Amino acid sequence: MCSTREEITEAFASLATALSRVLGLTFDALTTPERLALLEHCETARRQLPSVEHTLINQIGEQSTEEELGGKLGLTLADRLRITRSEAKRRVAEAADLGQRRALTGEPLPPLLTATAKAQRHGLIGDGHVEVIRAFVHRLPSWVDLKTLEKAERDLAKQATQYRPDQLAKLAARIMDCLNPDGDYTDEDRARRRGLTLGKQDVDGMSRLSGYVTPELRATIEAVWAKLAAPGMCNPEQKAPCVNGAPSKEQARRDTRSCPQRNHDALNAELRSLLTSGNLGQHNGLPASIIVTTTLKDLEAAAGAGLTGGGTILPISDVIRLARHANHYLAIFDRGKALALYHTKRLASPAQRIMLYAKDSGCSAPGCDVPGYYCEVHHVTPYAQCRNTDVNDLTLGCGGHHPLAERGWTTRKNAHGDTEWLPPPHLDHGQPRVNTFHHPEKLLADDEGDP
């Protein structure tokens, strides 16, 4: 039976009204057992809401175009709900596993993880339980048949109603051992798990590198580390580090680094060598290289930090060290407008991209955190209208936002030289027009003060 628009509107209005009443209550008159019982009610409601979201997400994904959404589904959810892109991606993937589906003929289909979806819909399991079950299912070897998979999923969903997520994870591990006692995995299974993630920078600038590597990559890393991570090799603490040949006995003896530190320095040296070799060719019209933006004031004071085209905050000491072997460029701005670019090496059109790295730092669409390395150059005034490529009429746009300019969105420059993104009327819900993510200092500056 299909619900009417009026029924849906009334139900959500009633939900909001009921929640408002609950928010206005005080609980001083209750006993401890009664308070615990109410917390169970809250947990049940919290667990049930995703079931509603799954259906909505799947219907939007099936029935909407990118023009109607203003981009890809995950990006739209992240911006509209003000959640991270990774969280939006997780919700889309979870909806695909637990949400209601339809066949190509329009016939309703049960969720892929039927038992888990049912338990969630009744509020018997929460996000933690769902995460354990989904991870278990996606980790199963490809040779496990559908009947066995469905039975294992039913068993885990039943156990999830009685145990905490951490306890359920241990049960899932035991079931995995029973189904695959010999640890037989195919190349397809390993390929599905492969991946490396460079985490966000901590307050000290350090980042965590995590993930899973294939046996082939592991063997390659071992061979490289055996050479470059040996004691005395690639030691940044030495004035003339040994990067070729064999280190002297004295270099090896004076090397006080731990094995993990030597591994780190070896990887850094090898990647730096690859960058300087020129064998990587070009990326977005520029030679593959590290591009750092900083201010003349910070350079003269030897304090502060620079910002790379990938969004990394680089201490000024590292900037100066890298600059010893780099081509230098000086970009001059009047507020948001580019005046000139001076450089120590002759450039042609790539100069405009360097200027945009210095000015925009990343995608100029409001709220977007994609750094400059992964952006395309966008004509604020369509090229078909202006017929020229003026750096003050250019901006950076990521692969998700750049196409929006041809799907009803318009862009323009304001008086400060910043790019404004104007959505079509059906997508306009009062969101910001200018991106300040890459330039948080603008939020702290007075409107009439220094840029």
UniProtKB/Swiss-Prot annotation:
<feature type="region of interest" description="Disordered">
    <location>
        <begin position="415"/>
        <end position="435"/>
    </location>
</feature>
<dbReference type="InterPro" id="IPR003615">
    <property type="entry name" value="HNH_nuc"/>
</dbReference>
<comment type="similarity">
    <text>Belongs to the Rv1128c/1148c/1588c/1702c/1945/3466 family.</text>
</comment>
<dbReference type="InterPro" id="IPR003870">
    <property type="entry name" value="DUF222"/>
</dbReference>
<protein>
    <recommendedName>
        <fullName>Uncharacterized protein Rv1128c</fullName>
    </recommendedName>
</protein>
<dbReference type="GO" id="GO:0009274">
    <property type="term" value="C:peptidoglycan-based cell wall"/>
</dbReference>
<dbReference type="Pfam" id="PF02720">
    <property type="entry name" value="DUF222"/>
</dbReference>
